[in-house]
Amino acid sequence: MVSCGPRKFSTPEDVQEVLELAGPNRPALDSVISHYRDEGNVFKEEAAYFLIGNMKKHGYAVYHLVDSTGEEVDFNVLSYPDYEALLDGWDELENRRGGLRFEVDTFYHDYHIVTAKYMIENIDLAYEAWNRFKWAGHLDFEEFCEYVLPYRSSNEPVESWRRYFYDKLSWVADSVKDPSDPTEAAIWVNNYIKSWFRFDPRYYEHPTDQGLSEMLDKKLGRCEDMTNLAIYAMRALAIPVMSDFTPYWANTGNNHAWNAILDRNDSVVIFMGGEANPGEYQLGHKLAKVYRKTFSIQENSLPEKLEPWEKAPPYLNSNTIRDVTADYVDAVRVKVDLNKGIPDSVNFAYLCVFNSGEWKAIDYTRFHGEKAYFSQVGPGVAYLHAFYYDEKIVPGGDAFILTDSARVDYLIPDGSNRINIQLYSTTRRITKETTDFSEEASFTPGAIYILYYWRDKWEEAGRAVAGKGPLHFSNVPSGALYWLVQEGSRKEERIFTLNSEGHQVWW
């Protein structure tokens, strides 16, 4: 991370490195530094060093969708009336053209494209807002650099949003009752965003986060777009706002990003841009791991530790995120055994949660011998520790439950002690109770359901056709982690264990 304090020495090495990478665009970046040196403003010069020095890994990609032959496929998320229709349309495309995937067409490094005019305007306006608005008075220079100054929030196209919102929302300063309260200012801004922008799940299939111009045009987006929009509007007024995210929920499918504000007491208060204000927002599912997006390069991030030949799983492959799990849950440290064999040339073990039909990595550690220690993880979750080899998750041990008391309970199928079980649901959310408090089955009559148990992979334990009552399975290995899936589903069903009474316990 490039220092964000008073500088007494020559141009930092990381800045020099980026200037060399900039190639033909180096004169633009050099002129930003020269501009503030000539102006004699040490703080703005330091701000320029912060942005340029941390620019190395920032940029955005333009994608295109291709089929199994590599031929480009025309696809627009807004061509479908709703998310279910989009998923059906995607399935229909894959049936006709084979597997679909987004491929990078062009990647634009920030150090190749940002102009001196853009950088200077961004720094000047950020600095002006920091000094103008009383609600930013509690920020030190390092907090200003991280939570106000950056010209981008994630991997979206670079656009001039700061001037737009600085002018558009100038009325907020006259509307707040307490001009020293950044949270009140954030509420005014968020109410403005809520008046015209909406969440739309179709944007789950949009290949990138949107830039401001696209959001102003469509007025729709996914959670990452909503957090970015709030960051644009609020940072333009020097309201210190950030984006936190969980790579994958621990007890349901998908992931999530949301906003947080650094209030005047230096406490972090969460909210959802365009949806729920600070003090009103609650996360809807279980957290195993939480990270905060940063502009500054995090030296302890996974990409900074990997050897050149090593790959990182999705979401952990960023060096501009930092772990803030302990801010959200009573995080614990867990030790696990690596007893499934260790692939060659692998230096890290990963902790995975089960999400949308797959084990997905949410944390990492450098292992020692046949032991691995993961720090700061959420309890009350089913985990699998694994390796990332050939860009695939490879089990490193048995799945386990990390209990609320931080005990590790391994889930090892016992084929010598087989049981008969009856099941009422594929997920916790659709389990019903009748008026006499007896459990009611919730299946699609006539549909085939497959019961799996985990033993280094999902092994089939039996099939059943749904009627009106529960599903019955016999001769099932006991003590395992189970997964009941409707044939042909999108694999959003949840995993479970069985308690001493044979009832499903959901994870």
Segments from the language model and where they lie:
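Sec-dependent bacterial lipoprotein signal peptides
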Residues: 1-2
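N-terminal accessory/pre-domain segments preceding catalytic cores
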Residues: 5-186, 236, 265, 288-507
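A structural motif
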Residues: 159-164, 197-203
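Hydrophobic/aromatic-rich core segments of domains that either
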Residues: 175-192, 203-213, 219-313
